[in-house]
Amino acid sequence: MKVIVTENKIQGSAKAFEIFEKGIKNGAKVLGLATGSTPEILYQNWVKSDLNCDDLTSINLDEYVGLTPDNPQSYHYFMQKHLFDKKTFKKTYIPDGMTKDVPAYCKEYDQIIKDNPIDIQLLGIGQNGHIAFNEPGTPFDIGTHEVKLTENTIKANARFFDNEDEVPKSAICMGTANIMDSKKIVLMAFGEKKAKAIKEMIEGPITEEVPASILQKHPDVTVIVDTYAAQELDDKYKN
């Protein structure tokens, strides 16, 4: 893993965009994208840039089950608001949270990923080490699946809703196996609340109890953290 420690989220987001921009200019065509507060500034940089996205395909990590695309808390809505309304992509894929047959749809999404191998995958990380909605205990070999959200994840996402009861209880998400198939991975984390997860991901044992720890086995991972998220790391990663 390559670890880049920046002073703050703004610098970290700029560094992440540099990696995506360079990758795209060097031929990357399929991008795995993420949602949430972590990548917002990255997407702002993307929108302000002159980067042409006409030939790009994007595949998003996840979507809440039961939210329509026009629901302001859906990840469809998030992506439209922060990127797709301003930059035209050749094709965009986001899991369908309103599908009537979730298991069949998950197989379809796996096929989409197989047909469009991801060149660069963007990730965040949860305080418990989850990536996408792959919670602790999720098998490393799993593909796209429906996941019941943990109480902690529901609480963490409640800030985006009027109250905790409105947070969906499950989501469709790419599995760890899908993520590991990406050619390159860029993971961003900011703030001291992420420090423990970052340390366990990079320095801890590879275990399904820390889903992100599997990234130690990937050949091309760049981790971008601010000084707060890096504070528990061994000094050798802070240079």
Curated annotation (Swiss-Prot):
It catalyses: alpha-D-glucosamine 6-phosphate + H2O = beta-D-fructose 6-phosphate + NH4(+). Pathway: Amino-sugar metabolism; N-acetylneuraminate degradation; D-fructose 6-phosphate from N-acetylneuraminate: step 5/5. It comes from the Bacteria. Gene3D superfamilies: 3.40.50.1360. Signal peptide: none annotated. GO terms for molecular function: glucosamine-6-phosphate deaminase activity; identical protein binding. Keywords: Carbohydrate metabolism, Hydrolase. InterPro entries: Glc/Gal-6P_isomerase (IPR006148), Glucosamine6P_isomerase (IPR004547), Glucosamine6P_isomerase_CS (IPR018321), NagB/RpiA_transferase-like (IPR037171). It is an enzyme of class 3 (hydrolase). Its EC number is 3.5.99.6. GO terms for biological process: carbohydrate metabolic process; glucosamine catabolic process; N-acetylglucosamine catabolic process; N-acetylneuraminate catabolic process. One of its GO terms (cellular component) is cytoplasm. Disulfide bonds: none annotated. The active site is at D62 (proton acceptor), N128 (for ring-opening step), H130 (proton acceptor), E135 (for ring-opening step). Catalyzes the reversible isomerization-deamination of glucosamine 6-phosphate (GlcN6P) to form fructose 6-phosphate (Fru6P) and ammonium ion. Belongs to the glucosamine/galactosamine-6-phosphate isomerase family. NagB subfamily. This is Glucosamine-6-phosphate deaminase. It comes from Lactobacillus acidophilus (strain ATCC 700396 / NCK56 / N2 / NCFM).
